């Protein structure tokens, strides 16, 4: 069963100054909106980080990544993210799409080195704040060096984890504050958000059972039941709180093929909208920088 958190329509809107001003006004009224590809400032308010994106509207013709598509798989350890990402990559490549599969932490030489540093299961304890900053550093390199260039080339980018994982694991799991960690991630990526975030929803007991068959686990996967329960709840809460965004909750139970078909139910309309926007030269708010978080008009 697929729960589509956000319903939206495809529209073609002229690239005019007025349309950009109206889009900006809608964004400014929505505190949960994250612009795509903007610079901003990271400040400290009441002992918390606060990110303020630049409010300058995008200029017509300044959307080099219009044709790209950025899809993220999220969920707890054992939810099936890596498996479903690989299945989707195979399916899309069979249809002729250029696809890059990547992961977090990782995706770049720096990111992979940081992944080894922060996830290695050893006796060295990593402070929660240091852990969050390591993930943010990996994500900054990932967005700048791999994801943005791929989107600019019209590539479909599939990522195993992204912003929501830090909000869930470090923000809630480590009790650092979801909003604080989200603002840190937004600053690190210059507000690069996915066109779609697919949360694979699997009961916590099933996740634990799947993990028991892996044999070896990393440092975070080895955390206790209370930590995992907080993270599991956090993912569901994040999807629910982003009801006006591009979050999709997909039932992760069942066979690999069954879950794959559910994932395709999410992805097919996105691909169709992407192709329509490209072929007709229209401004689909889902495929222009700064527009994916707002409802089509």
Predicted feature descriptions by range:
Residues 161, 165-233:
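A glycine- and Lys/Arg-enriched "phosphate-lid" helix/loop adjacent to the NTP-binding pocket
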Residues 78:
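Walker A (P-loop) phosphate-binding loop of P-loop NTPases
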Residues 73:
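Hydrophobic anchor at the beta1->P-loop junction of P-loop NTPases
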Residues 84:
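Hydrophobic positions on the alpha1 helix immediately C-terminal to the Walker A/P-loop
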Residues 66-70:
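Pre-Walker A (Motif I) flank of P-loop NTPase domains
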Residues 81:
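Conserved lysine of the Walker
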Residues 95-189, 262:
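ATP-dependent small-molecule kinase phosphotransfer cores
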Residues 41-64, 89, 205-297:
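NTP-dependent small-molecule kinase module
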């Amino acid at each position: 069963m697929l729960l589509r958190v956000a319903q939206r329509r495809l529209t073609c809107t002229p690239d005019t100054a007025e349309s950009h001003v109206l889009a900006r006004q809608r964004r400014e009224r929505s505190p949960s909106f994250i612009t795509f590809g903007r610079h901003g400032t990271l400040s400290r308010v009441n002992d918390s980080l606060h990110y303020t994106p630049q409010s300058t509207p995008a200029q017509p013709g300044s959307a080099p990544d219009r044709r790209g598509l950025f899809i993220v798989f999220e969920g707890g350890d054992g939810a099936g993210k890596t498996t479903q990402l690989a299945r989707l990559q195979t399916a899309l490549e069979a249809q002729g799409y250029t696809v890059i599969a990547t992961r977090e932490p990782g995706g770049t030489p720096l990111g992979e080195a940081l992944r080894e540093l922060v996830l290695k299961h050893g006796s060295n304890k990593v402070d929660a704040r240091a852990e969050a900053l390591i993930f943010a550093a990996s994500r900054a390199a990932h967005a700048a060096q791999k994801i943005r260039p791929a989107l600019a080339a019209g590539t479909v980018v599939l990522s195993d984890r992204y912003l929501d994982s830090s909000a869930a694991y470090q923000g809630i799991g480590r009790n650092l504050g979801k909003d604080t960690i989200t603002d840190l991630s937004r600053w690190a990526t210059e507000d690069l958000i996915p066109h779609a975030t697919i949360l694979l929803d699997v009961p916590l007991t099933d996740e634990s059972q799947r993990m028991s068959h892996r044999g070896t686990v990393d440092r975070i996967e080895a955390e206790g039941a209370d930590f995992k329960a907080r993270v599991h709840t956090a993912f569901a809460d994040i999807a629910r709180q982003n009801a006006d965004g591009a979050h999709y909750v997909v039932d992760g139970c069942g066979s690999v093929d069954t879950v794959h078909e559910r994932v395709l139910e999410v992805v097919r309309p996105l691909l169709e909208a992407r192709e329509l926007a490209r072929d007709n030269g229209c401004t689909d708010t889902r495929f222009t920088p700064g527009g994916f978080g707002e409802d089509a008009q």
